[in-house]
């Protein structure tokens, strides 16, 4: 059964690994296994909601612009305006809102179709280790193919769709959501800072969708309110700090440091899974 200290640790792990490209789903399998505790999907959902609050807190101005752009687009559509010919290029808020929508579509489809099967088949620590190595390879590759300067005004809907597909692959435990989206963005020619910003904002619909699907499981949580609150607050604080850290690092630091980390943890995880 969860206690407050374990909840704080897991909240910190979620907050850090959700935004740094090291796989939150993988770490939420590994850390409870090391601590000898069972959390379940319901507690994971509480932690994901905490990181969602962190995103809203850090990117609140961008989110307001996204909402504004979406509402204006809907108004245009009801008035018969062909937004895809003219308006999306003229109004940045509208264009960015639709870039997020287009990127969310494949993620949602993949999540609905694959999530249950993957969580059943690939939840073990051996698979986490294998997919952490995949994450490491993707990060390492992207650093050597990231010379683009594409920003919001230049990003195509095709590129948004590809990044959304890569985000959908994060249903595999050990595949980093932020890692796959930032890396795919870099390989597509996105500016480093914009690739990270788009990645974080693209995660909002995915986290909300996953939370709505799993909200029914929260009633099954065998933990006190204080334990849940501790995990939630911890994920918010560490999530916010991790976003701030990565947004600074992405400008001048290489993603190789995360690739090396995922490689080391992945190899150790595979060895322990086979030996123990």
Swiss-Prot record:
Q: Which reaction(s) does the protein catalyse, per the Swiss-Prot or TrEMBL entry? A: di-trans,octa-cis-undecaprenyl diphosphate + H2O = di-trans,octa-cis-undecaprenyl phosphate + phosphate + H(+)
Q: Where in the cell is it found?
A: Cell membrane
* Gene Ontology MF: a single term: undecaprenyl-diphosphatase activity
Cellular component per GO? Answer: plasma membrane
What is the top-level taxon of the source organism? Archaea
Membrane topology qualifier: Multi-pass membrane protein
Per the UniProt record, which residue ranges are transmembrane?
40-60, 98-118, 121-141, 155-175, 200-220, 227-247, 255-275
Q: What is its EC number?
A: 3.6.1.27
Q: Which Pfam families match?
A: BacA
Q: Give the UniProt keywords, A-Z.
A: Cell membrane, Hydrolase, Membrane, Transmembrane, Transmembrane helix
The main place the protein resides is membrane
Query: Would you identify the family this protein belongs to, as annotated?
Result: Belongs to the UppP family.
Question: What is the recorded function of this protein according to its Swiss-Prot or TrEMBL entry?
Answer: Catalyzes the dephosphorylation of undecaprenyl diphosphate (UPP).
Name of the protein described by the UniProt record = Undecaprenyl-diphosphatase
> Which species does this protein come from?
Methanosphaera stadtmanae (strain ATCC 43021 / DSM 3091 / JCM 11832 / MCB-3)
